[in-house]
């Protein structure tokens, strides 16, 4: 069984914001794999299905970004999901829009959703797909930037990165994450 989590904030006002690119990737996977995200438990919205013979759970925590671990840990405990069968997708300011970076482990890098996940799991050793949103320009505050929407010029690159993140997740169902890293980080 695999758990794929996208980080974001709940509510219409946060839809399609930079901070919600993880949610957008989960929506793409749900559409691609015909999984309904209609169960609300564990402080999140989730759905399950079978993909290439593997049971997959998709989760969008509804706790707000900074408390994401409060949703992830109880679901992992309930379904007895090992940390190596878990991947999290989230926005990253240090990566250009449209680009991905896959990592096996690491610090939160200033991302509060990842910080909460590390805190609740008790480890930094979990797989991540970091989705580029770039840094704010012209002295814009980071909080305003991440809670802002992508520009019309960025949308094609955003859509491409969402598709590539979904492709990486799909390959991960049948291949080691390290192999997927080598493919998608090149």
From Swiss-Prot:
UniProt keyword annotations, A-Z: Cytoplasm, Hydrolase, RNA-binding, tRNA-binding
Predominant location category: cytoplasm
Protein name: Peptidyl-tRNA hydrolase
Amino-acid positions noted as binding tRNA in the UniProt annotation, renumbered to this chain: 14, 64, 66, 112
Subunit description: Monomer.
Gene Ontology MF term list: peptidyl-tRNA hydrolase activity; tRNA binding
Entry-linked PANTHER family: PEPTIDYL-TRNA HYDROLASE
Site features described as Stabilizes the basic form of H active site to accept a proton, chain residue numbers: 91
Organism: Bacillus anthracis
GO cellular component assignments: cytoplasm
Compartments (UniProt record): Cytoplasm
Record field: catalytic activity: an N-acyl-L-alpha-aminoacyl-tRNA + H2O = an N-acyl-L-amino acid + a tRNA + H(+)
Site (Discriminates between blocked and unblocked aminoacyl-tRNA): 9
HAMAP family for the chain: Pept_tRNA_hydro_bact (MF_00083)
Record flagged with keyword Repeat: no
Pfam families cross-referenced by the UniProt entry: Pept_tRNA_hydro
Documented EC number(s): 3.1.1.29
Xref: CDD domains: PTH
């Amino acid at each position: 069984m695999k758990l794929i989590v996208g980080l974001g904030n709940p509510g219409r006002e946060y839809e399609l914001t930079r901070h919600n690119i993880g949610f957008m990737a989960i929506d793409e996977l749900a559409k691609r794999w015909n999984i309904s995200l209609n169960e609300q438990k564990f402080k999140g919205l989730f759905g399950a299905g079978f993909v290439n013979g593997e049971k997959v759970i998709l989760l969008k925590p509804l706790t707000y970004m900074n408390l994401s671990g409060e949703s992830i840990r109880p679901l992992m405990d309930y379904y007895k999901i090992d940390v190596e069968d878990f991947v999290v997708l989230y926005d990253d300011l240090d990566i250009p829009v449209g680009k991905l970076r896959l990592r096996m482990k690491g610090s939160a890098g200033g991302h509060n959703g990842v910080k909460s996940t590390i805190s609740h799991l008790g480890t930094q050793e979990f797989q991540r797909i970091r989705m580029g949103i770039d840094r704010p320009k012209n002295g814009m505050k980071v909080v305003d930037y991440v809670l802002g929407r992508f520009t019309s010029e960025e949308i094609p690159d955003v859509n491409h990165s969402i598709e590539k993140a979904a492709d990486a997740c799909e390959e991960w169902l049948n291949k080691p994450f390290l192999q997927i890293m080598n493919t998608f980080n090149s």
